[in-house]
């Protein structure tokens, strides 16, 4: 990313309050399940994952709006139950956003994590509509949801079949980007 001046990397977490938080580290899954929230039902679905606070990692938390990003129209969020806090810290960003791809839950996988209905309700305030949800498995209570701004709804009809095929694949991000912004170089 060093050669691309359009990409900036910040070594912080995102949330709704600027402070420092300690992370519950996942020791067995390449840290994919690490979270600022204490694991709850997550342990029922992945009993092999061990979480610890013994190896404490304190992470500085910033609000997305603190970065004053004005030229992005897509937001992707997968932060292990902290999704609603990231959204609340990015309300100004969300107002200018066209699409949000976010991990959602049907159960409380981490203590205090939002239910998909909480995400729906919050994003409705910004005129977003959930247009696609892909659960990992019928028996697994998490997945990914795609939200589009209400004024993009006519666009949905043309893409609805395509989204069903692309969501949860590595091609989805490129697919969305190619429809919403002009990509000059291959990713």
Predicted regions located by residue number:
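Phosphate/nucleotide-binding beta-alpha loop and adjacent structural elements of enzyme active sites
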Residues: 1-187
């Amino acid at each position: 990313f060093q050669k691309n001046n359009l990409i900036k990397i910040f070594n912080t977490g995102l949330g709704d309050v600027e402070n420092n938080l300690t992370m519950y580290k996942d020791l067995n899954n390449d840290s994919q399940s690490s979270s600022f929230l204490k694991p709850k039902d997550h342990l029922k679905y992945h009993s092999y994952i061990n979480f610890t606070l013994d190896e404490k990692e304190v992470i500085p938390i910033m609000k997305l709006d603190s970065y004053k990003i004005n030229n992005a129209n897509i937001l992707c969020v997968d932060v292990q139950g902290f999704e609603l806090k990231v959204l609340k810290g990015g309300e100004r960003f969300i107002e200018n956003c066209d699409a949000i791809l976010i991990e959602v839950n049907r159960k409380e996988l981490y203590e205090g994590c939002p239910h998909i209905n909480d995400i729906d309700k919050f994003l409705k305030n910004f005129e977003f509509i959930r247009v696609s949800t892909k659960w990992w498995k019928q028996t697994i209570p998490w997945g990914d949801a795609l939200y589009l701004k209400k004024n993009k709804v006519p666009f949905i009809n043309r893409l609805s079949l395509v989204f069903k095929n692309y969501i949860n694949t590595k091609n989805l991000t490129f697919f969305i980007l190619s429809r919403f912004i002009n990509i000059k170089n291959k990713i």
